[in-house]
Regions:
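Initiator methionine at the very start of the polypeptide chain
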Residues: 1-2, 26
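Sequence-structural signature of mature extracellular/luminal beta-sheet repeat domains
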Residues: 26-375
Length: 375
């Protein structure tokens, strides 16, 4: 998990099971021999990306994983016997799940390579309507030809998405911006596109502070050739803060960030980095200091997105699946599946939802999402 030419998938591929690549439509080239390993850069896009369609899934959903308990305290968060279910397939590469609404709400997620946002809602009993539908396409880059792709982009669509400002704030990595989407009209408004006169790399993930500030990460994973992309304007990958007036503050420029989260009381900021999961102190004004290692990379080997539950536990993608780490930094359990998991989201219906390569998974939990104003 070192620097150089490495893709977003490479961060979590090293320890994943070596399953054969799914066949994608002709426009979406696949890499032979299973998931890309460390040092791999995916081929440039040559056209719109389209995954092979899959039949819709209805309850009872197929079970594709299980829970491993590493500490007895895990039982307070999730039942070790709860199944890990596949609820939706047919993605090229799924990211950024976000729950909208209450118990009967719905899940939105980004298909980053296909440049669309997909909506999933639990089907009503007896329904034959497919529960997964395209909600917005293109979700990110449009381009002068309106085809929604470009050869200099690995992932033209949105990535991380959060509820904020009474709508949706997205890491619009295809456009290299942070943007707001109105949930009713689906109109997109750019909030920030760069810092000190230079464009962002490709914003990746975000988290909302209770005071309305938004912290986000800016690695180059959306660009072709990632760290070596000639389109990069910044010579660093930053952690930033988007202020309520849409001004931008640089938090850290010395790490290679990916996922990001805040403790329930907003006094701790967590960021995944190649060298491990970092934690910072956050003061009452939202200023950040005292970076230190929270979990070393050697403990879980690579990572991607993360979420903090209402009790302060971290649920983060890792080599094994979703590692569950308590506030003291101890890994107490793992959600394992038969393919990579990039990140997760807590639904108001009592489930944790997981983005896993070309599909969505879920598992019943005993914790919930942190409630914050505007979310």
């Amino acid at each position: 998990m070192t620097g150089g030419n490495i893709s977003r998938r490479s961060l979590i591929a090293a320890g994943a099971a070596a399953f054969a690549s799914r066949a994608l439509a002709q426009a979406a080239p696949t890499l032979p021999g299973g998931p890309p390993g460390p040092g791999t850069v995916r081929p440039p896009l040559t056209g719109p990306q389209v995954a092979t369609p899959e039949p819709p899934l209805f309850p009872p959903f197929p079970v594709v994983g299980s829970i491993e308990k590493l500490d007895d305290s895990l039982s307070d968060l999730i039942d070790v016997n709860t199944p890990v279910e596949k609820i939706l397939g047919g993605f090229v590469w799924v990211e950024g799940p976000v729950w909208v609404g209450g118990k009967d709400g719905y899940l939105l997620c980004s298909d980053t390579r296909a440049n669309k946002i997909v909506k999933w809602q639990m089907p009503k009993k007896g329904s034959t309507t497919p529960p997964g539908q395209t909600w917005l396409q293109p979700s990110g880059y449009v381009g002068p030809d309106h085809q929604g792709w470009a050869p200099n982009l690995q992932e033209p669509g949105t990535n991380g998405m959060i509820r904020a400002r009474n709508g949706l704030v997205v890491a619009d990595q295809g456009n290299r911006t942070v943007a707001f989407i109105d949930l009713k009209t689906k109109k997109k408004t750019q909030l920030a596109s760069g810092f000190e006169g230079k464009r962002f790399n490709s914003p990746n993930d975000a988290v909302l502070h209770s005071n309305g500030m938004i912290y986000f990460t800016d690695p180059p994973f959306g660009l072709n050739n990632v760290f070596n992309s000639p389109d990069r304007e910044m010579d660093y990958t930053g952690v930033f803060r988007l202020n309520p007036d849409n001004s931008v503050t640089l938090i850290d420029k010395t790490i290679r960030p990916n996922g990001i989260g805040l403790s329930p009381d907003c006094t701790k900021l967590y960021v995944t980095d190649f060298s491990g999961w970092m934690v910072y102190d956050v003061d009452a004004r939202g200023d950040v200091s005292n970076r230190r290692v929270f979990v070393p990379s050697s403990a879980v080997s690579g990572g991607d997105g993360l979420k903090i539950d209402n009790r302060g536990n971290m649920w983060t993608s890792s080599r094994d699946g979703i590692s569950i780490i308590n506030p003291a930094g101890k890994r107490i359990g793992i959600i394992r599946a038969d393919d990579r998991i990039s990140n997760c989201e807590f639904g108001a219906d009592g489930y944790v939802y997981m983005a896993s390569n070309h599909r969505l998974l879920r598992a019943k939990v005993k914790v919930s999402k942190i409630a914050r104003p505007g979310a």
